[in-house]
Amino acid sequence: MRDVFFLAMLPVLLFLMAKRPFIAVGMWIWTALFFPNAWLYGIGANFRYNLIFTAVTIVGYLVMKDKPKVRFGTLGGLILLFFFWTLASTAMSEGVPAVSWEYMTRFFKVILLFVFVVLIVDKKLHIDFFLWCVVLSVGFFGALEALKYIVSGGGHKIEGFSGHVLGDRNELALAFVIALPICYYLLQEYGKQSKMLRLGMMGVMGLIVAAVIGTQSRGGFIALMVLAAYFFVKSDHKIPLAIVGIILAGILSQFVSSEWTTRMDTIGTAASDESFMGRVVAWKLSFILAMNHPFFGGGFKALETYSVWLDLSKDFFSYSFFYTGDALPDTEHPHAAHSVYFQIMGDHGFVGLAIYLAIMLRAFLLARSIALRAQAHLGLRWVVSLATMLQLSIFAFGVGGAALSFAYFELMFAIYGLLLVMDTRILPRALKQQISA
C-alpha cells in the first residue's frame, strides 16, 4: 500500500515541483534526509527519488521567469572555495582514487543543494516550506522511533537505515539535535494559529529528545545537554523552560536502561574508556596525515584506506605531545576519524580545516548579525527567531560533530544557504520596505 500511495502521489508532486521550484528544493532535502526507498518494498523502492527531485529542481530553476538576484557573499565564497579545495585534494588523494572520487561526487551533490537553496529560496514561505520538509523527514522518523522506544519500555534501539547518510546511530542522534531548534522556530510561527498544531509540535520535540536518548549515542547526548544549556541561557522564558525540562527528564528516566546509564557514565571517565581512546588514536593518525600533507591532506577517506592507516601507524610515536594513553592503532582494520575537525584535517589538510572552520564561524556570526539587525523591527520577529534557532543548530553541530565523522552533512550546508538568503535578500528587502512605508 505504501508503494501504491507514494507512486500515486508522485505525478502530483512532480507537477507542483515543476510549477514551484521552491517546492522542489524542499522535496530535495526531504528525500535526502527521509530516504523514502527504505520505506517502500515493491516497485516504488527502485526509483532514485533524490535524483529525480534534484533534476526537477534544476530544470524548474532554468525555466523560472523571475529569477532572484543572487549574491553569495563571504559565506558563499568560503563554501565555494572549500569545494574547489576538496577537488584539489581529491585529485592528489593518498587513498584509493575511485573511493575518493565517489565521495567527492557525493559532496558535489551537497554543494549543489546549497547552490540551489541560494538560487531559488526567496521569501518566508519558501524558507518555512523547506524547514517543514526537514521536520517531516528527520523529525517524523525521530518521533516514530521514540514512540517505539517508549512502548518497548526503553528496549528498542534507535538506528538509521543501512546505506543512508543517517544510518549510523551517532550521526542520527546529532541530526535529531540539529532539528530541535528548527522545530522550535516552527512552533513559534505556527503554534499560535492552532492549539492542535502547537500541542503536536511540542509533542514532536519531546519525542525527538526521547529519540536522542534511545540512540544511546554519547555524542548525541552531550550535544543535547549543551544545546539545552545554551538555549536556556538565550531564552526569555527560563522558569517555564526549566519546569518542562525537569518534567521531561523525569519521564524519560523511567525508560532508560542500565546499559544506557553505564554507557553515559563512561563520558566522565573518557581517558580510561577503550572506545573513546580508540577515537583519540584515529584523531592522532589524522593529525599525522595532515602533517605529512599539510596543504591538501590525504583526500576523501584516505585515513580509512588500510595501506595509508598502516603507514601512518609507523609514525604514531613521533608526536608525543598528542596524548593517547596506552591505546595503539588497530593493525587489522582502519577506522574513521570520528570528528568533523580531524576528518577535515586528514582529508583536506590544515588549509582545508581553516576554510571549514571559517565557514562555521562565519555562519554562526552571520546568524547573530541577522538577528541583531532585525531585532528593532516589529515585522521581522520571525527573522530574529529563525536566525537564533539556526545559530543554535550550528552550535549543536559544532559540539556534537567533535566526536563524529559527519563533516559533509547536507542539512548543515542547506542551513548555511538559508542564512545567506536571509542576509542578502530577505532582510535587506524587508528593511527597505519598512523604510519606504
PLM regions with names:
Residues 40-44, 92-101, 213-214, 402-406:
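Membrane-interface helix caps and helix-loop-helix hairpins in membrane proteins
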Residues 147-152, 209-215, 231-274, 284-292, ...:
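A membrane-periplasm/extracellular boundary helix in multi-pass inner-membrane enzymes
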Residues 8-17, 80-91, 108-113, 126-158, ...:
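Alpha-helical transmembrane segments of multi-pass inner-membrane proteins
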Residues 1-3, 44-52, 102-106, 165-178, ...:
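Membrane-interface micro-motifs in multi-pass membrane enzymes
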Residues 1-88, 97-98, 122-132, 186-199, ...:
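Transmembrane signal-anchor hairpin modules in multi-pass inner-membrane enzymes, especially those
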Residues 158, 163, 268-284, 296-348, ...:
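Long extracytoplasmic/lumenal interhelical loops at the membrane interface
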Residues 30-42, 339, 343-348, 381-423:
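Membrane helix-loop boundary segments at the extracytoplasmic
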Residues 56-60, 240, 359-363, 392-437:
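Transmembrane alpha-helices of multi-pass inner-membrane enzymes
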